[in-house]
């Protein structure tokens, strides 16, 4: 035992000595890495040995990394006294500030960077440095807070001035714009030819083959010395008659101011040589003799001429003379213009269809067509108008030659004397009164006249045009509202004030099945019943009568009823059986109430109906009163309102015999 303890103590001392002899390279407390693997061996002597791989604390491993040196310590269980010492030593180690474990490797321990960075203060410092770096980076993007508002304004002004320096000068821009405008004006002026004074002359090459013929320059004078009309007859052409028409009698010195004019050659002149003599056509002659259109000068023109030539008084006098001259020339032109062509003369022509008047132009299509062709071009020349009018008058004066056809046989034309639609009887009478058919002279065949150009007939009168005021058909007569409409039978109002035969039969069936019931229980007195003679139950003698006698008796009874109706009608006492009645011909109010309640009408309505038909005032109704009451119930069910009084036509509809006779048709 002593030998074992001595060996263990020697090993422990050697380990502590080795730890104490090595210098401390780091200020931080070291940790001892203890391997979790423990080899527990039981000696044959009964002692437990704990062998573990341990590394020296803060020891520098100088061996190569492939085979690190790991001293093995064998733990030997000692007695209780030794174990107490070991526990105390472990407590001292645990209470010491150095930790038991260390995360750094021996290589990391040798490097100063790892040792310095592993400190908490260094870590906190590095975090602060990173935060400060980020804060300065974000502040660099913003404007400096040290700048004053005045400094900022100066910087903005400098930036604006720097930008304006790059913009080109406004004067240069204006010069450039003026240059472009002047170029446009020059191009316009080069294309326009004007004369404004005596000194301004136009020099043009007359020998060039230009489509425009200009007036000679020696004849261009001041435009305000005299008045000259503008002889333009269209918006594209201007033809001075003094140059184009050498035969005109217009004096050049008396025409007034002259303006340069442009003559546009027609396609005909461009195709043919004008210098070569040729025969002018009518169209060319008419185009050359076109009358001028006068254009008077304005007051501004006269004012300009006054400023250049003379005083203001001379200008005013000159202006008044010009106005007078212009008005005079206008009046002369109006007189020179040809008048409208008169209508052709109407000549009577005979035809089978009736007498009417027609002009010669309609019968001679060639002449009318030629006149239209010649008159299609409007001209102001007086000679042309007179010649044309004279030619038309000569055409009208000449006799018209109609084509001749062989005469037709009378046998083939005898059917043509019949009266036609729209022909008066006088024309037919004249043809028949002349004698035989051979005496009647038929007119020569003429050229048919179209319906569009034919004049209206003389005997036909213009009818007055009457416009429709509505789209409805006025020919249809207005139907009576009370008349029966087959298409709408539900809108028939003809039987509203009378009881129809079908309804009467239906009501009589209800009456026959309920009359005279429950009178055995009646205690009150009923009007018209003779209680002294046995309650009016008289036995009637049944007598066989012939049908003729029965019909005569019924007709006599009806006449008596009508006479009584004339005196009082349905309001009489006999009609309501007030003076004379039979129990079998009455119906009690309790029965009537049960029948009428089946209609499900309100009790107030049924009470009003009872008051309208109750003439007996004893709680009973006779046959006419019951039938009228049933009809009023049906009318209320149909939706009609009750009247204050039952119409007389309803009571009169019940006075008939009630016999319907059917007539058989003939075989």
UniProtKB/Swiss-Prot annotation:
CDD domains: EH (cd00052). The gene is IRS4. GO terms for biological process: lipid metabolic process. Positive regulator of phosphatidylinositol 4,5-bisphosphate turnover and negatively regulates signaling through the cell integrity pathway. Involved in rDNA silencing. This is Increased rDNA silencing protein 4. PROSITE patterns: EH (PS50031). Residues 568-661 form the EH domain. It comes from the Eukaryota. Residues 81-91, 133-144, 276-289, 325-335 have a biased composition (Basic and acidic residues). The lineage of its organism: Eukaryota, Fungi, Dikarya, Ascomycota, Saccharomycotina. Residues 1-10, 18-33, 46-61, 92-109, 234-248, 376-394, 424-437 have a biased composition (Polar residues).
């Amino acid at each position: 035992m002593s030998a074992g303890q001595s060996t263990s103590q020697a090993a422990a001392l050697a380990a502590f000595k080795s730890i104490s002899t090595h210098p401390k390279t780091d200020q931080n407390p070291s940790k001892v890495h203890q391997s979790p693997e423990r080899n527990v061996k039981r000696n044959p002597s009964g002692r437990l040995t704990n062998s573990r791989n341990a590394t020296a604390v803060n020891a520098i491993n100088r061996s190569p990394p492939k085979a690190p040196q790991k001293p093995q310590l064998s733990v030997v269980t000692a007695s209780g006294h030794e174990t107490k010492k070991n526990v105390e030593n472990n407590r001292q180690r645990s209470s010491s500030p150095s930790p038991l474990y260390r995360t750094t490797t021996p290589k990391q321990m040798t490097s100063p960077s790892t040792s310095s960075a592993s400190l908490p203060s260094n870590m906190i410092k590095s975090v602060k440095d990173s935060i400060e770096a980020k804060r300065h980076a974000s502040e660099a993007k913003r404007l400096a807070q040290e700048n004053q508002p005045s400094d900022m304004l100066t910087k903005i002004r400098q930036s604006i001035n720097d930008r304006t320096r790059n913009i080109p000068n406004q004067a240069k821009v204006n010069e450039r714009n003026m240059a472009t405008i002047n170029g446009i004006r020059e191009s316009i002026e080069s294309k326009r030819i004007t004369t404004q004074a005596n000194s301004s002359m136009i020099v043009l090459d007359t020998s060039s083959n230009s489509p425009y013929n200009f007036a000679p320059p020696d004849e261009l004078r001041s435009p305000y010395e005299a008045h000259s009309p503008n002889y333009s007859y269209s918006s594209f052409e201007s033809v001075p008659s003094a140059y184009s028409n050498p035969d005109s009698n217009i004096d050049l010195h008396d025409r007034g101011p002259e303006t340069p004019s442009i003559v546009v050659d027609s396609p005909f002149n461009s195709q043919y040589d004008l210098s070569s003599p040729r025969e002018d056509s009518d169209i060319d002659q008419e185009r050359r003799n076109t009358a001028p259109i006068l254009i008077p000068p304005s007051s501004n023109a006269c004012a300009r001429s006054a400023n250049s030539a003379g005083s203001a008084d001379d200008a005013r006098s000159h202006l008044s003379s010009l106005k007078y001259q212009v008005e005079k020339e206008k009046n002369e032109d109006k007189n020179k213009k040809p008048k409208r062509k008169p209508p052709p003369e109407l000549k009577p022509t005979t035809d089978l269809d009736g007498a009417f008047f027609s002009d010669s132009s309609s019968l001679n299509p060639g002449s009318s067509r030629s006149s239209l062709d010649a008159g299609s071009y409007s001209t102001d020349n007086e000679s042309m108008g007179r010649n044309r009018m004279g030619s038309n008058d000569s055409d009208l004066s000449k006799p018209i030659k109609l084509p001749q056809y062989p005469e037709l046989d009378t046998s083939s034309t005898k059917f043509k004397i019949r009266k036609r639609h729209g022909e008066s009887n006088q024309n037919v009478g004249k043809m028949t009164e002349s004698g035989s058919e051979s005496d009647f002279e038929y007119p020569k065949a003429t050229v048919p006249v179209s319906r569009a150009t034919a004049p209206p007939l003389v005997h036909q009168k213009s009818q007055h045009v009457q416009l429709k005021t509505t789209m409805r058909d006025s020919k249809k007569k207005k139907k009576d509202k009370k008349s029966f409409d087959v298409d709408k039978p539900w809108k028939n109002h003809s039987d509203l004030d009378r009881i129809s035969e079908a309804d009467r039969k239906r009501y009589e069936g209800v009456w026959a099945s309920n009359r005279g019931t429950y009178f055995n229980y009646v205690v009150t007195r009923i009007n018209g019943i003779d209680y002294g003679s046995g309650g009016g139950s008289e036995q009637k003698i049944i007598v066989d009568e012939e049908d003729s006698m029965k019909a005569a008796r019924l007709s006599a009874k009806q006449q008596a009823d009508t006479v009584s109706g004339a005196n009082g009608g349905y309001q009489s006492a006999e009609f309501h059986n007030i003076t004379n009645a039979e129990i079998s011909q009455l119906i009690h109010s309790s029965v009537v109430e049960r029948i009428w309640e089946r209609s499900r009408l309100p009790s107030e309505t049924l009470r009003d109906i009872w008051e309208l038909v109750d003439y007996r005032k004893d709680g009973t109704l006779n046959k006419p009163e019951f039938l009228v009451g049933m009809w009023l119930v049906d009318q209320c069910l149909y939706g009609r309102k009750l009247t204050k009084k039952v119409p007389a036509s309803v009571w009169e509809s019940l006075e008939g015999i009630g016999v319907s006779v059917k007539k058989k048709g003939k075989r």
